[in-house]
Amino acid sequence: MTRVKRGNVARKRRNKILELNRGYRGSHSTLFRTAQQRTLKALTTAYTDRRKKKRTYRRLWIRRINAAVRTKGTTYSKFIHTMKKDQIMLNRKVLSQLVILDPPSFSTLTK
């Protein structure tokens, strides 16, 4: 049986991991085993933080809307309740942008 040399495949796999770890400090960018662990951890935190970003932005939008609505003399929960009751279908992101970019049109919503 002929001999199968796998050097190219293994080297490509290792170099792919090491390429992802450029810019890391110490052995995390040069040694394969530590680089592999660091890559796994980095990819898992990137995955979780992509989901966490959605939560943090929603909280930011709610805080902006709440601050703007309280200047008009009502609370956030009452404002959202009246929006739903009047069937105004604007999401929190759009409302937050209205607060920042177009305050007069937002004040018409609070009336």
UniProtKB/Swiss-Prot annotation:
CDD domains: Ribosomal_L20. It is found in: Plastid, Chloroplast. Coiled coil: none annotated. One of its GO terms (biological process) is translation. It holds the Pfam family Ribosomal_L20. Keywords: Chloroplast, Plastid, Ribonucleoprotein, Ribosomal protein, RNA-binding, rRNA-binding. Gene3D superfamilies: 6.10.160.10, Ribosomal protein L20. This is Large ribosomal subunit protein bL20c. HAMAP family: Ribosomal_bL20 (MF_00382). The keyword Plastid applies. GO terms for molecular function: rRNA binding; structural constituent of ribosome. Its main location: plastid. The gene is rpl20. One of its GO terms (cellular component) is ribosome. InterPro entries: Ribosomal_bL20, Ribosomal_protein_bL20_C. Binds directly to 23S ribosomal RNA and is necessary for the in vitro assembly process of the 50S ribosomal subunit. It is not involved in the protein synthesizing functions of that subunit. Belongs to the bacterial ribosomal protein bL20 family.
